[in-house]
Amino acid sequence: HTVVHSFPTRRSSDLNKSLRHNFFLDHREYPYKNVKPRIIAEQYMEDEDGKGLKDYKFFCFNGEPRMMFIATNRPVDTRFDFFDMDFNHLPFAQGHPWADGPLSKPVNFEQMRELARKLAKGLQQVRVDFYDINGQIYFGELTFFHFSGNCPFQPVEWDERIGSWWTLEK
């Protein structure tokens, strides 16, 4: 069923502005070229610890999860920590520093990895995002252009290594 709430004029204006925005023009990401903008309202989610949600983002190549990162402290002091599929911390950064201390392997790590594999099946490359809130997994999004393809890994040799995982059809 549909629930209608009245919004303050400022918020309504912001929503209307978003509906006129063409996201294709931002970074020329072709899947967005002919998408008609829509507003989707989701339930607000927070973890019981009150420290903000952690994003679990799996990089899949040819349908297989190869690495993931955990985004913490969003949006004020964002931290990214990258891990292989055995949950070993990887020695590079991208766009944000590492967390101040070690991060624990999520209890639902294996289930999230399997869900990422299923969602990535048949795709050459995709990032599959999840939240794990109080033991419940929530799907975030599928991303075909991580950082719009414009944020190198540091040190840069990781760009080449990760790029080698992507097999393009000829």
What function would you assign to each model-found segment?
Residues 1-9, 39:
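Single conserved hydrophobic/aromatic residue that forms the stacking wall/gate
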Residues 6, 77-83, 149-153:
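A short, polar/proline- and glycine-enriched secondary-structure boundary/capping micro-motif
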